[in-house]
């Protein structure tokens, strides 16, 4: 009886060990996919897989960074990213190993992404603070990145002033070509005032394919 019990326990231990290895192997595979999608800027594909990784290991700062970055790039409501990026900046490391699925700390750029998320949430002081935090991770010879962060800080400072000193505007429909019955938002006007760029959830966009939330999503450009 004791021998039989030992055999059963050995089998259970072996099965659990195999399950653990299988989960780690699956994690490694999906981590590589998300890492590649984020590198390519394909946040829509990265988002659902990032969620799976986070469900598997919700204490992993690197995974939280991936999920937050995916939300920041893919979801129209970028404020969702804040929760995960705030978690990730709690364990940022200068020794971060890029592309390593065993890495549990987050990269320095997490501060930059969190700053962007704060900016979209109108939390401009928090955005500015985190842009400055990110500057300590920039190579002294990387003038391009340094200047980009400087420009983002100026954007947040200007946005803060605009919110504190609002300007009266008149909202006017631009007609059915521009305004649809669906959600149209995030308009941007080019510097010369001749081009309008905005996001729309109108039917038939995204090549006829639905976004992960069951709606269409496309950026429209009108001149």
Regions found by a protein language model. Give the residues of each.
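Structural motif corresponding to the intra-repeat A-B loop/turn of tetratricopeptide repeats
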Residues: 40, 74-75, 121
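Alpha-helical segment of the N-proximal tetratricopeptide repeat
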Residues: 25-56
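TPR-repeat structural position
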Residues: 43, 77-78, 124
